[in-house]
Amino acid sequence: MFRFVNRGVNRRDLLKQGLTAGAILALPGRALAQAVTDPLTSEFDRAFAGAAQTQAPAALVEAAPPVPVYDPAYNRCLVDIARRELGRAGAKVWRNDIVGIADFARSSSQPRFHFVNMESGVIRSFLVAHGRGSDPQHDGWLKSFSNTPGSEATSRGAYLTCEWYKGKYGTSIRLEGMDSDNYNALNRAIVMHPAPYVDPSMAAHWGKIGRSEGCFAMSQGDFNEALWHLSGGRLLYADRIV
């Protein structure tokens, strides 16, 4: 069990004051989007190195149909985790209708980012990338978590979803790490954003999707679901779900 870390930021008040018209512009002078600088060496990376970053507004890109999770026992586990983490977070999270759970025990080719509706019990699942530092061989499986700056790895634990901002990949969502294993999220620029290297066709063809630098990267269409249903003071939890 991770402990929540008090970072001394009243994020709830900040979000309440700043979330107007459903979107927030970036704070000036602060760019938290990722920049891919490492040389591309694998066959997969060479094939998709030239993929253009989408310039279309997120709202104009249609999401792929979410993939439901049919395993009743797994569904119950997700709901139990969502309830547990909401209870652990308490007043730090001020929108508890939907909880995002990223299950990094699954391959990146599988829809493993689960949006749990706490009111209806409906669970919708999407593709999400993990960090390249968590998967150096790029075989599609997360090997380790890290909270260390420069690791380019995914961090486990509970996050508070914050405001929207404009970055390299367009509209993105800031994240505040609330655990001892992810408290560097803001400093590491760990965010949620769309990316051209996350796509169902890539997963089907290669058995994996691309890697981020630690961010929760989604396909452009799926990311619309995150913008409207997971941002603005909700809970995101990342771990290996057994």
Q: What residues fall within each predicted segment?
A:
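N-terminal secretory signal peptides and thylakoid transit peptides that target proteins
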Residues: 2-22
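Boundary at the C-terminal end of the N-terminal hydrophobic targeting segment
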Residues: 31-33
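Glycine-rich, aromatic-bearing surface loops/beta-hairpins
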Residues: 35-37
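Short cysteine clusters
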Residues: 215
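Cell wall/extracellular polymer interaction/catalysis modules
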Residues: 39-212, 220-224, 228
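A short beta-strand-loop micro-motif that forms or neighbors metal/cofactor-
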Residues: 229-242
